Swiss-Prot record:
Entry annotated with the keyword Cytoplasm: no
Keywords: Ribonucleoprotein, Ribosomal protein
Protein name from the UniProt record: Large ribosomal subunit protein uL30
Subunit structure: Part of the 50S ribosomal subunit.
Organism: Lactobacillus acidophilus (strain ATCC 700396 / NCK56 / N2 / NCFM)
Annotated S-S bridges: none
Source organism superkingdom: Bacteria
Gene Ontology CC terms: large ribosomal subunit
InterPro entries reported in the protein's UniProt record: Ribo_uL30_ferredoxin-like_sf, Ribosomal_uL30_bac-type, Ribosomal_uL30_ferredoxin-like
């Protein structure tokens, strides 16, 4: 099973409201904040909508 390490590299300020909600829902706050989430279809779908704001790495357990 793999997890995804997601880091916010660009600010969500001045972005579409939907994109800001996704950033908040993923648990990201400020720039350079990082979360580890399970690799599943729901997470991948959310990441595609904010791909220009984040950096993603796969972590093997």
């Amino acid at each position: 099973m793999t997890d995804l390490k997601i880091t916010l590299i660009r600010s969500a300020a001045h972005r579409l409201p939907e994109q800001r909600k996704i950033v908040k829902a993923l648990g990201l706050g400020r720039v350079d904040s990082t979360v580890v989430l399970p690799d599943n279809a729901a997470t991948r779908g959310a990441l595609l909508k904010i791909a220009h704001l984040i950096s993603v790495e796969e972590i093997n357990k």
